[in-house]
Regions:
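Binuclear metal-ion centers of metallo-dependent hydrolases, dominated by the metallo-beta-lactamase
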Residues: 122, 214-308
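Active-site metal-binding motif and surrounding structural segment of the metallo-beta-lactamase
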Residues: 39-90, 118-120
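Active-site-proximal loop/helix segment associated with metal-binding centers of metalloenzymes
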Residues: 16, 131-208, 212-221, 227-229
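Active-site neighborhood of divalent metal-dependent phosphoester bond hydrolases
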Residues: 83-118, 273
């Protein structure tokens, strides 16, 4: 099952000619999840040829303009692609008012259900057959949350030799065992999945953190992430400015990644004071703490593979 992230916009505060505002799309086995929807989100979706008809849920960190101004257009255009499935929108207080006001003022034609749920973190906000999305509190100038999407454990590796020893014929019964179902062998005896499967294997974890002061509690929330998308807005020399605006420096983001033992971190939400040529300052500072750090850029594609 594939899991991959697309950085639709990596900028903070204001768009630049080469940098849209914050938005990340996560694709998991055909399902699409959008995290924030800043200005320019539609442009990246189109340029990447991603079918936003498949977006089933949108997760909003907070209601500052650089994280939500792309939403109305996404919702309107979804009506132009024959969408009938509902779309769920999760976010802190005011997100429902923003969506409803946008629909009314813009006289939006919507031909599918929009279900908006305001949340109080920490909590599980969205569940699927084999994953959960959890929200947790951040510390910004207004109510702000981070998110993790975490898969449940997978069955252990299938042992074909053991299946043969237990007289389970090759074919559909093997697949049933791998999917967790008991079967009958050639002698009519019951064979359980645990008899032919190894130790359970962990699923994958994706975390999204932006617009916050450094908080030790974030470390526990994102611990073990296969991919952490995290703001690194300022260099360390501007830490006082970061604190005043309730943002993090690149070093603080890297500290979270290191302490949480994440496999990979990509930074987003750069201050517009940095041109692309100047972003190396943020990268160098972050990598001095956590080498598995990289800079994101608009329309960047990141595979999130299983460890085993």
């Amino acid at each position: 099952m594939n899991m991959e992230a697309f950085i639709l916009g990596c900028g903070g505060m204001m768009p630049l000619p080469y940098r849209h505002l914050t938005s990340v799309l996560l694709r998991r086995d055909g399902d699409l999840f959008l995290f924030d929807g800043g200005e320019g989100t539609q442009v990246s979706l189109r340029r990447l040829n991603l079918k936003w008809k498949k977006i089933s849920a949108i997760f909003i960190s907070h209601t500052h303009a650089d994280h939500i101004t792309g939403l109305p257009g996404i919702l309107m255009l979804s009506s132009q692609v024959d969408r009938t499935e509902p779309i769920y929108i999760y976010g802190p207080p005011k997100i429902k008012e923003y969506i409803e006001t946008s629909r009314r003022v813009l006289d939006m034609y919507i031909n599918y259900p929009i279900i908006v749920k305001e949340i109080e973190a920490p909590c599980v906000v969205h569940t699927g057959k084999d994953y959960i999305v959890r929200a947790f509190p951040l510390d910004h100038t207004k109510t702000c949350v981070g998110y993790t999407l975490e898969e449940m454990d997978r069955p252990g590796e299938f042992n074909p030799e053991k299946a043969r020893e237990l007289k389970v014929p090759v074919g559909p019964l093997w697949a049933q065992l791998q999917n967790g179902s008991e079967v009958k062998n050639e002698d009519g005896q019951t064979v359980k999945p645990e008899q032919v499967l190894g130790k359970k294997r962990s699923g994958r974890k994706f975390s999204f953190v932006t617009d916050t002061l450094f908080k030790p509690s974030i470390i526990d929330e994102v611990r073990g992430s296969d991919l952490l998308v995290c703001e690194g807005m300022f260099e360390e020399a501007l830490i006082d400015q970061a604190k005043e605006k309730k943002h993090m420096t690149a070093k603080q983001a890297a500290t979270i990644a290191k302490e949480a033992d994440v496999r990979r971190m990509t930074m987003i939400h750069y201050s517009p004071r940095y041109t692309d040529k100047e972003l190396h300052v943020l990268l160098e500072e972050a990598q001095s703490i956590w080498p598995n750090t990289e800079l994101s850029h608009d329309r960047m594609h990141i595979e999130i593979p299983y460890i085993d």
